[in-house]
Amino acid sequence: KNRWLLRFNETECKVNTDSNFTNLKKSNYPFPNMEDLGFSSSPIQVPEFDLNKVVDYDKTRNIPSLDSTSKIGPHLRFGTVSIREIVLKVKDVNSTYLSELIWREFFMQILWHFPHVVNQNFRAKYNGIQWRNNEEEFKKWCNGETGYPFVDAGMRELNKTGFMHNRVRMITASFLCKHLLIDWRWGEAYFAKKLLDYELASNNGNWQWSAGTGCDAAPYFRVFNPSEQIKKFDKAHTYINKWIEDLN
């Protein structure tokens, strides 16, 4: 992060694209529809992003019951907003939020310089981990039926909306890798299938962080206690009760 900030230059964030449009060749090719590309419509709606929520991000970001995150992930993923514009807007507003954007850039650099991370551990010394890879337990994790409320709430939110709060992503990922001892690649692939904001670099980087196999990862002995996480971040069970109806 510190190295990134040292090299950060506002001038490089300003791209005068309008002045370059005249260089583009004009054509009248037919524009394909979604069906032509092999896509079908989904009832899941992509949320609008709201940068007003960035102001208190450092104070509210870990409370999943609050609608306090910007929801900008899908827009960054598909390029409907400019990362340069977002950085310029938030750099003096909330340093914690800026740090999250820097993490995104960091994981992209990791993927570029160390492409083996796509399907291998960043740290080869962890290649010998003996994963249990119990398929029935993995299925319960995917469906939000593990019996651990915080984990199940997160997975049900993901399955229903294509979104999961970042704090809950860490909890569910840690649970899969360090409680169930299921290979992080299984979880990464499931998130890739479900997340609206999925992009390879961040998804891979964060899963390897959770598993302890990444370049700047949570150590293997750091295990998120799903019960203690409730006490810290969802004490009133507001988030859990929203997504696990059978607990109400």
Describe these PLM feature segments.
Residues 126-132, 190-248:
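C-terminal, helix-dominated tail/subdomain
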Residues 164-167, 181-189, 199-204:
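Extended hydrophobic-aromatic, low-complexity segments
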Residues 1-126, 233-248:
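Glycine/tryptophan-enriched, flexible segments
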Residues 118-140, 145-146:
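Alpha-helical cores of eukaryotic small-GTPase signaling modules
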Residues 65-66, 87, 130-135, 168-171, ...:
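Short acidic (Asp/Glu) and glycine-rich catalytic loops that position anionic groups and cofactors
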Residues 71, 86-89, 97, 106, ...:
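Short, hydrophobic/aromatic alpha-helical segments in well-folded domains
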Residues 103, 112, 116, 160, ...:
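Short, well-ordered loop/turn and helix-capping segments at boundaries between secondary-structure elements
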Residues 108, 113, 136-182:
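C-terminal substrate/ligand-recognition segments
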